[in-house]
Amino acid sequence: MSKVLVLKSSILATSSQSNQLADFFVEQWQAAHAGDQITVRDLAAQPIPVLDGELVGALRPSGTALTPRQQEALALSDELIAELQANDVIVIAAPMYNFNIPTQLKNYFDMIARAGVTFRYTEKGPEGLVTGKRAIILTSRGGIHKDTPTDLVVPYLRLFLGFIGITDVEFVFAEGIAYGPEVATKAQADAKTLLAQVVAA
């Protein structure tokens, strides 16, 4: 039995193309892998706090007593990392907002990037500690950006996930959704076709 973590990050709730792909993934995965356990975390509905000067002190051990707010942040970070480590397949619904990922997803990454916990520094350079995972990225975009300099989402996600140890990463794209209903419908249908193949693989 595999455990699957689905992370949603769109601010558009049920109107979101990436959230619709995430829901489709869950349906397809449950049908193909009935015994697997799926956890869905909506980072927009349950937002992660923005890392600031106070909260960063909670994630970097210094021996100083933590404030109540820092204690809450550290407990949340521990919870998120434990959840990440406990799952085998990590599905990230990552729409493109202004050429990059949503703030909600960046806040999540800031809360799980902890030296000595999800990565460590060695004489040979940084080493990721979140290993043995498969990541599937569902990314929707208003325009056409795949394989162009305007796509900052793919290289960033590959870099960050690889940094913490997740190197098995595949992408499913839904592009051109702002070009009109017909284009959006086709983009969603094409993405679902590919996603069904990914689930079956």
UniProtKB/Swiss-Prot annotation:
Arranged from A to Z, the UniProt key words for this protein are:
Flavoprotein, FMN, NAD, Oxidoreductase
Give start-end ranges for the coiled-coil region(s).
none
Per the UniProt record, which EC number(s) apply here? 1.6.5.-, 1.7.1.17
Query: Which top class of enzyme applies to this chain?
Result: oxidoreductase
Keyword Nuclease (UniProt): no
Q: Which reaction does it catalyse?
A: 2 a quinone + NADH + H(+) = 2 a 1,4-benzosemiquinone + NAD(+); N,N-dimethyl-1,4-phenylenediamine + anthranilate + 2 NAD(+) = 2-(4-dimethylaminophenyl)diazenylbenzoate + 2 NADH + 2 H(+)
Can the keyword Flavoprotein be found in this entry's annotation?
A: yes
Provide the binding site for FMN: S10, S16, Q17, S18, M96, Y97, N98, F99, S140, R141, G142, G143
InterPro entries membership: Flavodoxin_fold (IPR003680), Flavoprotein-like_sf (IPR029039), FMN-dep_NADH:Q_OxRdtase_AzoR1 (IPR050104), NADH:quinone_OxRdtase_FMN_depd (IPR023048)
Q: Per the entry, which co-factors are needed?
A: FMN
Note on how the cofactor is bound:
Binds 1 FMN per subunit.
Query: Which family does the entry's similarity section mention?
Result: Belongs to the azoreductase type 1 family.
Q: What does the UniProt record say this protein does?
A: Quinone reductase that provides resistance to thiol-specific stress caused by electrophilic quinones.
Subunit structure, as described in the record: Homodimer.
- Can you say what this protein is called? FMN-dependent NADH:quinone oxidoreductase
Source species = Yersinia pestis
